[in-house]
Curated annotation (Swiss-Prot):
This is ATP synthase gamma chain. Keywords: ATP synthesis, Cell inner membrane, Cell membrane, CF(1), Hydrogen ion transport, Ion transport, Membrane, Transport. Residues 10-22 have a biased composition (Polar residues). It comes from the Bacteria.
Length: 297
């Protein structure tokens, strides 16, 4: 009986230590989430402004009768055939964040199978140790690998990562590029995002007039459009990273909160078991004492 009591006490002590760890991890992620959420908010504002300028340049070109936009970043035709496609996936470098990583991985696997059935060759480019390790374990090739980027994204790092992807697209090595990641929705939920970032498509209403820029002459418009297109793709990559980071911390807060609560419930359950074991030990001792007393009589 004594051994059982010691075992339960050890379990209680171990569970309490785990509870302290998960609680601390929740607090750390809560602090990081505030920073990541603010970064995502500011990035979204900039992305909208960039998109507005981008639309304005395209609208100006079309208003002047230049329907043939001279930029390699745009789709040449709506019904173009896709034979080769690149998927960029973003996962965390670490686990302990619920279904955050596996949701992205499952979506990538689903897309790979879907495109395979359509006869489209798919290549992977990975950000985040968890996803990269998963595909390596399953002997699935990942072309470009970035560990540490999803945990500390900067525009410069995003720009460097997407450089090879853009070059492959412009050289015809791939026909389309998709980013798959978990996006931040709110404090308690994340939303799976699957976005095509290349080629660019832009919807301009027939009579839409440009309002932001005053660019001359026509050649300059196309030069600016090409530079804007490149920056637009780079910033989409950066925003996906920032959005994913906020979602990661949100998921980790939920996971650590659930783990902390579960540990608390387990401690309560073990404490009840400990008290029962103590009562049984006391009862056994009393029975043995009474039995001894009766034997003496």
């Amino acid at each position: 009986m004594g051994g059982n009591l010691k075992n339960i006490k050890r379990q209680i002590s171990s569970t309490k230590n785990t509870q302290k760890t998960t609680k601390a991890m929740k607090l750390v992620s809560s602090s990081k989430l505030k920073k990541a959420e603010e970064l995502a908010r500011r990035s979204k504002v900039y992305a909208k402004q960039l998109s507005a300028v981008f639309h304005d340049v395209v609208a100006k070109i079309r208003v002047r009768g230049l329907d043939n936009i001279n930029s390699r970043y745009f789709a040449k035709s709506e019904g173009r055939e896709i034979k080769k496609l690149d998927i960029i996936f973003i996962t965390a470098d670490k686990g302990l964040c619920g279904g955050f990583n596996i949701t992205t991985i499952k979506e990538v696997l689903r897309l790979m199978e879907t495109y395979k059935q359509q006869g489209i060759k798919v290549r992977l480019r990975g950000i985040g140790k968890t996803g990269i390790s998963f595909f390596a374990f399953n002997d699935i090739e990942v072309l470009d690998k970035a560990i540490g980027l999803s945990a500390a994204p900067t525009f410069e790092k995003a720009e460097a990562f997407i450089e090879n992807v853009v070059e492959d697209f412009l050289n015809g090595a791939t026909d389309e590029v998709i980013i798959v990641h978990n996006g931040f929705k709110n404090m308690i939920s994340q939303e799976l995002e699957s976005q095509a970032i290349l080629p660019l498509t832009i919807n301009i209403k027939q009579n839409e007039q440009p309002s932001v820029l005053n660019i001359e002459p026509e050649d300059e418009e196309n030069i600016i459009l090409d530079e804007l297109a490149k920056k637009y793709v780079q910033y989409n990559m950066y925003y996906a990273l920032v959005d994913s980071l906020a979602a990661e911390h949100s998921a980790r807060i939920q996971a650590m909160d659930a783990a902390t609560n579960n540990a608390g419930d387990l401690v309560k359950s073990l404490t009840i078991s400990l008290n029962k074991a103590r009562q049984e030990a006391i009862t056994t001792e009393l029975v043995e004492i009474n039995a001894g007393a009766e034997a003496i009589k």
